[in-house]
Amino acid sequence: MEARAIARYVRISPRKVRLVLNLIRGKHVDEALTILRFTPKRASGIVAKVLKSAIANAENNHGMNRDNLYVAKAVADEGPTMKRVFPRAMGRADIMRKRTSHITIVVKEKE
C-alpha cells in the first residue's frame, strides 16, 4: 500500500528541488524530516510540507503505521514556465523564465 502527496505549480525551479529530494529518497520518514529541518535550502521547507501531507494521507486515508513508513518515491517534474521581459543594455530585452515545479512524494510501509 502506498500514499502520496503532490504539490503543483510551486514557484521554484525543479532543478533546485531535486537537490533536496535526492537527500531523502529511500529514507525513513522521521529521518527524512530531520534531514529537511537542517538543510539550508528554500526547497527544504516546501518538501517538508509535502512529506508531512503524504504521512498524514498514509495514516488517515490508508490506516498505515507511521513507524514503518519510508520515502519510496520523490520526484520534481517541470510545471509551466512564466516568461517575463528582462531589460538589457542598449534597448535590448531578454526573456526571464520563472520556472515552476510539480513535487510528488510517495510513502510506503516497510514489510
UniProtKB/Swiss-Prot annotation:
Pfam families reported for this sequence: Ribosomal_L22
GO MF annotations, alphabetized: rRNA binding; structural constituent of ribosome
InterPro entries: Ribosomal_uL22 (IPR001063), Ribosomal_uL22_bac/chlpt-type (IPR005727), Ribosomal_uL22_bac/org-type (IPR047867), Ribosomal_uL22_CS (IPR018260), Ribosomal_uL22_sf (IPR036394)
The organism's place on the tree of life at top rank: Bacteria
Keywords of the record: Ribonucleoprotein, Ribosomal protein, RNA-binding, rRNA-binding
PROSITE patterns per record: RIBOSOMAL_L22
Family from the record: Belongs to the universal ribosomal protein uL22 family.
Protein name: Large ribosomal subunit protein uL22
High-level lineage: Bacteria, Bacillati, Bacillota, Clostridia, Thermoanaerobacterales
